[in-house]
Amino acid sequence: MSPRTAEHMTWHQSHHAVDRVMVHPSDGEAWKHFNSVHPHFSAESRNVCLGLCTDGFNPFGSFDAPYSCWPVILTVYNLPPGMRPKFMFLSMVIPGPSSPGRNRDVCLHLLIDELTQLWSSGVLTYDMSRKQNFVMRAALMWTINDFPAYGMVYGWSTHGKLACPYCIENNKAFTLTNWGKASFFYCHRRFLPPNHRYRKNRKDFFVGRVEKDVAPPRLSDEELLDVVSEYGDIVFGLQSGKQKFPGFGLTHNWVKRSIFWELPYWKTNLLRHNLDVMHIENNVFENIFNTVIDEYYLTLILHF
């Protein structure tokens, strides 16, 4: 690493932050929470904060030959936003031809072992900018996936009426009459402030009623760890996808205990998983645009 790059490895802590303006993840609540919980880690600004992204794709670009391989990419968040794309590391590729499903954790085991070592004991590293050795440690701040991949990595099935990993059994999902198995989730207004005008709006919302419920309670770190610990005993292999825990689809959607829980600090992370905004932003734009131009089959307005 060049002296200039090594100097920028402390940018996340030394840059000027503006109140209510987020230019870097270190300005966010999750990063600040991690620093407060682990002061010995945050005291050394050269310690590395990582993000992990993975998703499946067909490398042949053809739907005629189904194939799914999964690259696992690590990115360094210490650097300024403009430098991060150059320091994205392909740590592994999970080969196809089919999706690894729950067996993904078997492939990730070596990576988790290395991350655990980097957190617990660190690695002796030479700092080119300061011309000195130091023990560098590293922490995985979060993962980034689209929603289907999120379910595979996290261990919570994103299908069915319990697809929402936040609401869990406290959702208000129902099946549309003419849409077969598709579940319709209509819980978003309860996350609004109590006096928000959309809560009382009957006219412009599908269900046509006033929303009085509040958002479901958020599980604490210990409560969530206790829950996922109940779903850790699965046997990986060809039959792993056929194993189901009691109550699946009725009271929960857990299919496994994610291997990321083996990281000693994972339970203290405030934000463990992020949704990839690429599809979200693209879908929102297309829906709004097609509604504005009144494209009959693509508009958000329901025609009966």
Give names to the regions the model predicted.
Residues M1-F304:
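Domain-level cores of phosphate- or acyl-group-handling catalytic modules
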